Amino acid sequence: MIGAFKRQLLSNLAFIFLFSFLFAVYCQSAIFFFDNAEAVRENTAASSDFTERLILLDAGHGGEDGGTVGVNGINEKVLNLETSAALEVYLRFAGFEVVQTRTEDVLLYDKSTDFKGRKKMLDLAERLRIAEELLPDLFISIHMNSFPDGKYAGLTVYYSPNDERSRVAAELMRASVVEHLQPDNRRELKRAGSNIYLLDRLDTPSVLVECGFLSNAEECELLCTKEYRHKLSFVLFSSVSSFFEE
């Protein structure tokens, strides 16, 4: 009887602890968002045209394609999607129209076609089709980086060579990150080559953001926290709003 009571008590305590933890995480995220709400308004006060601006967010990988794997075992695809979702919150709050290429853990290929050995290519082709159909004012692809040597860290921005405004957007993103989040970041902007499928083919302003190195233990740990992803997303949002005020 006593053993059953203790098991029930421990079960109840575990539930209370879990609920308290999840509530604390929610409150922390909410506090960060509302603490920055005034900053969002200040960022958008200079322009009344944001409601006419379409941002296409592209969370890289998904489904069967997990992307790179962090030192702690996290799949890149998860962090890409969560970072894109956080960025969307700030953009929408400021009045931007936002579309995501994916909002679920999926690869974007037609499962009714002959996809064997072609899933990744079909996925990229579908993302390209979406972007060419929507013609966004800015295309932002979200990814995470990795390298065999775990000493490397820091956000990196690639820009499309097909529209000069892509480099402008990338420069603003890098500058904002250095000023507000990573003051020691010395990573240079990178012009996308043919190996970056989407940026090589898109004619609209397009950037790809490698948010950090999952091969670096410290940075991987940061990127796995909701608080840091929201800070990063806010910094990226700030640069996007500056881009449309240029």
Regions picked out by a protein language model, each given a short descriptive name:
Residues M1-E246:
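Catalytic-site microenvironment of enzymes
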